[in-house]
Amino acid sequence: LGLAIGPLSWPQKNLSQASDKLPDADSVYSGSYSKAQIQDLISYANLHQITIIPEIDIPGHSRALMKALPDSFHEAGDNSEYAGYGNNSIPVCEFNSDSALGQKFTADLTNILTQTAQLFNQQTTLYAVNNELSIGGDEVFKGTWDDAPSCQTAPWNKMTSLQKEHYFLDTLNNNPPINQLKLSGWHEFVLTHDGQINSKHSIKPNETGHVWVWGKSSEVQSKAVTLANNDYPVILEYADYSYFDMTYTPQLKEPGFYWASKLGDTDASLSIAIAATNTQHQSNKPDNIIGLEGALWTDVIPDYTQLQYMALPKLAGLAEASWSAESVTDIGGKPNWQSLSYRLGCGKEGFLAYLNSVYQANYRGYPNGIEQEAPMLCNTANSVNP
C-alpha cells in the first residue's frame, strides 16, 4: 500500500495522484496523509494487532524520490541504461561526498528515512520492531550507475551494480542517525547474485529488522536457507504461492499475472505451508524463518472491488498456512485443502458466507461474488469432513 506522507520537512514536494483508473502518462495524482491521520492509522493497527512497516524504496524503484526532489536525488550526467530504462536509481556514489549534490543527497536522504521511521514508532503490537524501516533494495539491475560521473573513481569504479548497492547501504547503515534504525528489505539488499552473504558490506543480522525472500520458490528457497543459517530474520514471500496478483485461471478475461504461476488461487496460498516446512527442514536454524507474507501490488489494481477479488479468499489460505499447525495444513506432504475448503464455503454457514453478509466483499466469482460458487450441500452426507 503506497501512502504519500505529508508531515515531513518537504510538504510542498508531495507527489500527486488523481485517477481511479490505472495510471498512465496523463494521470495526475495528489494528496497526502497528515501526521494526525498517520497516528490514527497506527492507533487502529495497534488495537487490531496489525504491524505497519514503513518503506522508502532505495536505491532502485526510486523514481518518486527523484521526481519530487531532483536537486537531491538525480545526478544530471547519469545516462545509464538498465532493464530497458533509466532514471530509476538514486546517486549512491554521491553519498557522504563533498560535492554540492552529495551534501544535499546525504542530508535529505538521512532526514527522510529518519523522519519516516519516527512517524511509525508508536506501535505496540506483538511483532513491532522499534525504529524499523524497509528500504526495499530489490531489482538494482546490471548497468545501473555505469555512466554516473560520480561512480567513475575508486572504490566505485571497480564494483558491479549490486556491489555498489551493498557498499552504499552498509555506509548508510553506519551513518548517524541511520545507525539507530533497523533497516529491512528484500533479499537482494544483503545477498549477492549467487545467493551468498556479502561478507564485506552486508548489513549485519542484528542490525536488520526483517528480510523478505521473494521469487519462485524453486529459485529462491536456497537463499532463504542461507539467510536463516546466518541468523537473519526471514519472511517467506514465495511468488508462486503468495503473490495475490497472480491470476486465478489462465482464461483470457481473468485479471492478473502468470509469470510466477499459472494458477494463483486459494489452494496455492495454502500450499505455501508445504514450501515453508520444506524450507525450515533444509535450514540449520529454522527458527529464523519467522513468518509468511502475501503481496498484492496495487499499481495494477484499478479499484477496491478488484482488490477484494484478488485478495479473497486467497488471504484465508495464507492465514491457514501461517497460523495453523502442520498437522492441520499438511497431509502426507500435500496441502490439506479439503479441511480448509469445508470451513471456507458451506453455503450460509462458511467463512465466505460470513464475509459476504458482513462486508459484501467482491471475491471469487467475479463480478457477482461467492454466492455463485459456494457449495450448498455442506451439511449433507456428501459433504467433506474437515
Where are these regions (language model features)?
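Feature activates predominantly on carbohydrate-active enzymes
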Residues: L1-T110, T114-F120, Y127-N130
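An acidic- and aromatic-residue-enriched active-site/binding cleft used to recognize and process polar
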Residues: G6, I50, E55-H61, G137-V140, ...
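Soluble non-cytosolic domains of exported or imported proteins
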Residues: S32, A36, A100-Q103, A107, ...
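Anion (oxyanion) recognition and catalysis
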Residues: Q39, N46, N173, P177, ...
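Flexible glycine/acidic-rich beta-alpha junction loops that bind and position SAM and/or redox cofactors
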Residues: S62-R63, G143-T144, F244-M246
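Active-site neighborhood of glycoside hydrolase catalytic domains
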Residues: P70, E81, N87-T208, W214-T226
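Flexible, acidic glycine-rich loops studded with aromatic residues
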Residues: L183-P386
